[in-house]
């Protein structure tokens, strides 16, 4: 049994999360995860879910009675989601810690918006295919 299971059970007790009213109005995350089967789609959803948990855990960082549980689960998330890659985890936490109400963050985000949108565009990845087609046409024309 993974160490996080015992600690998650500990958190369930602490938050009284086993009570029947917790199931009211369905699940938060599990239904969404069921909707997505492709790995890349699931990773997008999982990143938002992991971000939520990191923010939740941050709210309880000073609560000594659950500190061990929170740290154990965060470490296990690091292994499972970030493949124990500290740089990836640090960058992820950096992104989740930006405050959308901070004027400097807002200004920088707007300044970078065009470049970020270009990175999101699948058209960026089609350049290689076009070159290959051009090379092929060039060879055929010279034969």
UniProtKB/Swiss-Prot annotation:
Its main location: secreted. Keywords: Antiviral defense, Cytokine, Glycoprotein, Growth regulation, Pyrrolidone carboxylic acid, Secreted. It holds the Pfam family IFN-gamma. The keyword Secreted applies. Glycans are attached at residues 25, 97. It comes from the Eukaryota. InterPro entries: 4_helix_cytokine-like_core, Interferon_gamma. Type II interferon produced by immune cells such as T-cells and NK cells that plays crucial roles in antimicrobial, antiviral, and antitumor responses by activating effector immune cells and enhancing antigen presentation. Primarily signals through the JAK-STAT pathway after interaction with its receptor IFNGR1 to affect gene regulation. Upon IFNG binding, IFNGR1 intracellular domain opens out to allow association of downstream signaling components JAK2, JAK1 and STAT1, leading to STAT1 activation, nuclear translocation and transcription of IFNG-regulated genes. It comes from Pan troglodytes. This is Interferon gamma. Disulfide bonds: none annotated. PANTHER family: INTERFERON GAMMA (PTHR11419:SF0). GO terms for biological process: adaptive immune response; defense response to virus; humoral immune response; positive regulation of autophagy. The keyword Glycoprotein applies. Coiled coil: none annotated. The gene is IFNG. It is found in: Secreted. GO terms for molecular function: cytokine activity; type II interferon receptor binding. Homodimer. Interacts with IFNGR1 (via extracellular domain); this interaction promotes IFNGR1 dimerization.
